[in-house]
Amino acid sequence: MFSCKQHLSLGACVFCLGLLASTPFIWCFVFANLLSLEIFSPWQTHVYRLGFPTACLMAVLWTLVPAKHAVRAVTPAIMLNIASALIFFSLRVYSTSTWVSAPCLFLANLPLLCLWPRLAIEIVYICPAIHQRFFELGLLLACTIFALSVVSRALEVSAVFMSPFFIFLALGSGSLAGARRNQIYTSGLERRRSIFCARGDHSVASLKETLHKCPWDLMAISALTVLVVCVMIVLHVHAEVFFGLSRYLPLFLCGAMASGGLYLGHSSIIACVMATLCTLTSVVVYFLHETLGPLGKTVLFISIFVYYFSGVAALSSAMRYKLKKFVNGPLVHLRVVYMCCFVFTFCEYLLVTFIKS
């Protein structure tokens, strides 16, 4: 049994790791909203808006790096992250021309920020389920803070409102070591120690083994994703559902996908129910979008994604359970949900940019 102090300590650490895991998405969100104006800076706008799918893809690529090399990158990464954020802060305050320097700064810092989701998720999803909810709460809170800053135009008024970004980096990077030292995490890691494996200290699931254990879960996630992408295309062309949402939807997609959703009961039943709700809601929006008005149409359109996230969360939770004996089970989860993030954010970019409703 573990003490209450150990649980509280780990809960605080994983909450801070949730703040840390949000930083690549917040970085993209801030640049896409503050510095992208299609009339005055067309190519910069495309760079910033493509940052969302790029961040998802880079987070997946970081999972291919061996754990010992990823851990060694922590100190240089945090130093360069903070330095880049300080330079951006200075440019916002003192410079009037950032049309070249800002995109270079954005592209230089983004790959290093994408290291944090990998390191955070690798720790969090080895811990008990209650601590995973703390992580998801931290990620959701961080995304919400910056979304509200943009809605209230606080970031446009003063660069001081970038300060939470520095706090997230400092708290999160400092919590990595604390979470690894916690006895609850180390006991979870010990349960994944290999006994008969010749390579490595812990059991690692290969691609073949993952496909063997979770074929139907992966197929169901793929089918749900294709369904919602088709819904996005049809509703964008017919009902103009992205009008007024293009500034906030990418952050919502990344944050909600990484956070999961509400999942209770059997995963296959939940997935079927959520797919049915997605289909019925999209039919309502398609035929009644003029009657619903802008607000009703937007609420129903967002609810389609909430249903989708809940279905994927149930399926990914089932995958993590099937891979619970493997130390890289959390990384398999990251690859699946962040590839879904990539598909949605890239699809949203193509629809809003090139296919006019």
UniProtKB/Swiss-Prot annotation:
Q: Which organism is it from?
A: Epstein-Barr virus (strain GD1)
List the ranges annotated as motif Integrin binding site.
199-201
Q: What is the lineage of its organism?
A: Viruses, Duplodnaviria, Heunggongvirae, Peploviricota, Herviviricetes
Q: Which residues lie on this side of the membrane: Virion surface?
A: 1-11, 68-70, 122-133, 180-217, 262-267, 320-335
GO CC term (a single one)? host cell plasma membrane
Q: What does this protein do?
A: Facilitates virus attachment to oral epithelial cells by binding to host beta1 integrin family. Participates in rearrangement of cellular actin to increase intercellular contacts by binding BDLF2 and thereby promote virus cell-to-cell spreading.
Where is the protein found, in the record's own terms?
A: Virion membrane; Host cell membrane
GO terms (BP aspect): symbiont entry into host cell; virion attachment to host cell
Domain-level remarks: The RGD motif presumably is the main binding site to host beta1 integrins.
Family in the record: Belongs to the herpesviridae BMRF2 family.
Q: What positions belong to coiled-coil segments?
A: none
Which keywords appear in this protein's UniProt record, sorted alphabetically? Glycoprotein, Host cell membrane, Host membrane, Host-virus interaction, Membrane, Transmembrane, Viral attachment to host cell, Virion, Virus entry into host cell
Q: How is it modified after translation?
A: Extensively glycosylated by O-linked oligosaccharides.
Q: Does the keyword Membrane apply?
A: yes
* Protein name, entry field: Protein BMRF2
Q: How does it assemble?
A: Interacts with BDLF2. Interacts with host beta1 integrin family.
**Which residue ranges are assigned to the Intravirion compartment in the record's topology?**
33-46, 92-98, 155-158, 239-240, 289-298, 357
Q: How does it sit in the membrane?
A: Multi-pass membrane protein
